[in-house]
A protein has these predicted regions:
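Cell-envelope/extracellular polymer assembly enzymes that use nucleotide-activated donors
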Residues: 4-7, 35, 191
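A conserved acidic beta->alpha catalytic loop
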Residues: 40-50, 68-70
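Donor-binding/catalytic cores of nucleotide-activated saccharide
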Residues: 71, 92-207, 213-229
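Short aromatic/hydrophobic "clamp" motif used to bind/position activated sugar donors
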Residues: 87
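Catalytic core of nucleotide-sugar-dependent glycosyltransferases
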Residues: 208-217, 222-251, 266, 270-293
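Boundary detector for helix-to-coil junctions that initiate low-complexity/charged tails
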Residues: 310-371
């Protein structure tokens, strides 16, 4: 058995100073028996120099170079060099609590799990604020801990998010299940993560905040999803095919269908430009028909999605946008009216009216006197 407890794989492409912060956070982890595999995905900035300098300070760092092929290929490449008992796939722009790897590793070994998931929050690079991210790991949906997909079959794709960086994986589990990341520009960890949740013999959820996920970074691929608008569709279809191949689709069908509908609308709501219409038509003509929603009983599909599904099936893209616009305007007006009523009924408003009444009354009296 390797003496390395955790192999940390970090794909980097033009990571700049955010990557430097990430790398030194990993170097300063309290768990020392680690290897740090930095896969340079053809960077043209100072990323290579950052790795080289860090490697002079820390012999645990390995520098691996590849021509630009994307983060998924870089992670898979990193796995070829990994020797640790567990593997952590980290993003080059995030940063970490010093005890992240130690706490995740100790709990993974203690509970003998294939996957350990832990909590994170968001760091807004524009406002420099930390924001809650409770949706990324919903403890209230986990009935027992450790657990398997069978314990949460109706929520297995909902209790956490399909990204890899807040999870620690047993390396032998990855090898045995032949898990790899899809070569997609975005959504490239979805297939790996969600298929691993169904294949894992045991999963543990660690209720500690250990990672800080950087958002609103202009260098992030997630802010240019218009260039890869259909990646979510390719990833979800590959996941469904894999679930069918291993004979587990029907066990998790309710969770998959509800997640896929939700994920499709999330992609629609968060994409801009010409890609919006492309995603809309993809949902209308490909995704919804492929799910055969009419076959399911009432209550199978969450009530959160029923109306939107009906609208997409009923309208073309322009009609749908027009309908959504008026719904939002009506909601905004209602919110404004309700706010005005609350203000008028508030004690502050009433006191203010009394205070203002006296000088206004005097002002009117003086005007009459002048006449």
């Amino acid at each position: 058995m390797s003496d390395i407890k955790v192999s940390v794989i970090i794909p980097v492409y033009n990571g700049g100073q955010a990557f430097k912060k990430c790398l030194y956070d990993v170097m300063n982890q309290t768990l020392k028996d680690i290897e740090i595999i930095c896969v340079d995905d053809g960077s043209t900035d100072e990323s290579a120099q950052i790795i080289s300098q860090a490697a002079l300070e820390d012999s645990r760092i390995q520098y691996v170079y590849q021509n630009n092929q994307g983060a998924a290929v870089a992670r898979n490449k990193g796995m070829e060099y990994a020797t640790g008992e567990y593997v952590s796939f980290l993003d080059a722009d995030d940063f970490y609590e010093a005890e992240m790897l130690e706490k995740a590793y100790i709990n993974s070994v203690k509970h003998d799990v294939d996957i350990c998931i832990f909590r994170g929050n968001k760091y807004d690079a524009s406002s420099h604020q930390y924001l809650s991210m409770d949706y990324a790991l919903r403890f209230h949906e986990i009935p027992c801990n450790p657990f398997t997909y069978k314990d949460i079959s109706d929520n297995v794709f909902h209790f956490c998010v399909g990204w890899a960086w807040d999870k620690l994986y047993r390396r032998q589990f990855i090898i045995d299940e032949k898990l790899s990341f899809q070569n997609l520009r975005t959504s490239n960890d979805l297939f790996f993560v969600f298929s691993s949740l169904v294949k894992a013999k045991k999963i543990y959820a660690l209720n500690e905040l250990l990672i800080h996920h950087r958002v609103n970074d202009s260098l992030s691929l997630s802010v240019t999803r218009e260039k890869s608008w259909n990646c979510f569709y390719l990833a979800a279809n590959a996941l469904k095919q894999e679930l069918e191949r291993i004979g587990k689709y029907h066990e998790v069908e309710k969770s998959f269908v509800n997640w896929y509908v939700h994920f499709s609308f999330w992609n629609l709501d968060t994409i801009e430009g010409d890609a919006y219409k492309k995603v809309y038509e993809l949902i209308k003509y490909e995704i919804l028909p492929s799910l055969h929603l009419e076959q399911y009983p009432a209550g199978f599909l969450s009530t959160n999605y029923v109306k939107r599904v009906f609208d997409v099936q009923s309208y073309d893209c322009d009609e749908y946008v027009y309908e959504q616009f008026f719904k939002l305007r009506k909601k905004a007006k209602q919110k404004s009216d309700d706010g005005a009523k609350r203000i008028k009924n508030s004690k502050t408003y009433k006191v203010g009216k009394i205070v203002l009444f006296i000088p206004l009354h005097i002002k009117k009296w003086l005007k009459r006197r002048k006449k």
